A protein has these predicted regions:
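Alpha-helix-loop-beta-strand connector modules within alpha/beta enzyme cores
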Residues: 55, 360-362
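Glycine/threonine-rich flexible loop motifs
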Residues: 33-48
Length: 362
């Protein structure tokens, strides 16, 4: 096991996460409500800004990397805040949530949803837990869902609603002997699966054969910056251990009477020039990130880049409109490094009918 100190340097955290297969977020003091845009309640207890900042960053980075996570007590609250949720600064208690009994003594019940990871772990809709908290999750955030509550409605457990292996519980299973150990066994199993997946990625090459990121170039996206508007960027490729992607120059198909220039955001004379412009922009991205990116044209290039620790970009064209009725342009684009050209896309053209077209030729 690795104990991670409260480190503010994201590079240190990222490098640490590269060596981890699972993450436990432990109990502790209150969170600073300023993280949630709230002013402090008079009933707020001790806070630790340094720990808050480090753990919130840690969760977000681990989330992006699909690392299995278990949050305990404060840890469930850390999960919620980091992933867009909120926490009550001090709960109104109908059930005693800060017991005086021994830590190993369960003192109240928790009702569990049947379609949840927690139900799969315990095979029961109700379990008994211990309780040592005055704060609790109020909103799980858009990435998480509520899977267990106490009888007074306090959220006792949340999990990912995106099929990520993330679970948070408000109680302390580490004090509950064999019953509590079941949750830790779940994390061990998920960490084992994650480790196996990472080892698989080391042995094989993963190639995304189609990426629409260039469609967003007119909106100012940068491939070397994490951007929620696009599904593939350099950071997401790294997080997901993806080795290569094929960036396509998508050419919209004008209808009869429409000009091509009216369908695209850049000022170009025709489809070929537009495709060239997209490829120029991709090559500019690669040129600025040579330590991390390379243009690949062959399988040998792909495997060479993987050995060198670089991500590969291959080039493609979506819509044979780019050929401009000249078959010699097939050779031209091949020499530019284009690895495939689809004959059409979402409309009939002079080459063929589209599956979504109007049967122009047939």
């Amino acid at each position: 096991p690795v104990i991670i100190p409260p480190v503010a340097d994201s590079t240190v955290i990222i490098n640490t996460l590269e060596h981890l297969d699972g993450l436990i977020l432990t109990g502790g003091g209150d969170h600073n409500p300023l993280w949630m845009g709230e002013e402090p309640s008079p009933r707020l207890h001790n806070i630790n800004q340094e720990r808050d900042a480090a753990e919130l960053m840690l969760v977000r980075l681990a989330f992006n990397r699909q690392i299995p996570m278990l949050g305990i007590c404060r840890g469930i609250q850390t999960l919620a805040i980091a992933l867009g949720g909120k926490v009550y600064q001090d709960i109104k208690q109908m059930v005693k949530h800060s017991q005086d009994a021994d830590r190993s003594e369960p003192t109240h019940s928790v009702e569990i949803k049947k379609d949840s990871t927690l139900y799969h772990i315990y095979n029961s809709e109700k379990i008994l837990v211990n309780s040592f908290h005055h704060q609790a999750v109020s909103e799980p955030g858009r990435h998480m869902r509520i899977i267990a509550k106490s009888t007074d409605g306090i959220i006792e457990a949340i999990e990912s609603n995106e099929y990520k292996q993330i679970l948070g519980v408000q109680w302390h299973p580490e004090w509950l002997g064999e019953e509590g150990g079941k949750i830790f066994q779940w994390l061990v199993n998920q960490a084992g699966n994650f480790h196996a997946a990472k080892q698989l990625h080391k042995r094989i090459l993963t190639l995304d054969t189609h990426c629409d990121t260039p469609m967003f170039f007119p909106q100012g996206v940068k491939f070397d910056h994490r951007d929620s508007r696009i599904l593939v960027d350099l950071h997401k490729m790294t997080d997901g251990h993806q080795d290569a992607t094929t960036m396509v120059a998508y050419l919209p198909q004008p209808k009869i009477g429409e000009s091509f220039s009216s369908k695209v955001a850049f000022d170009v004379q025709g489809p070929l020039q537009y495709a060239d412009l997209i490829f120029d922009k991709i090559e500019e991205i690669v040129s600025k990130n040579r330590d991390y990116l390379s243009i690949a044209r062959t399988p040998a290039d792909l495997y060479s880049d993987k050995r060198k620790g670089r991500k590969s970009i291959m080039l493609g064209i979506e819509n044979g409109l780019a050929l401009e009725h000249d078959l010699s342009n097939v050779k031209y684009f091949a020499q530019r490094g284009v690895v495939y050209i689809t004959l059409c896309h979402n409309g009939d053209n002079d080459i063929c009918d589209s599956a979504r077209g109007c049967n122009t030729h047939n």
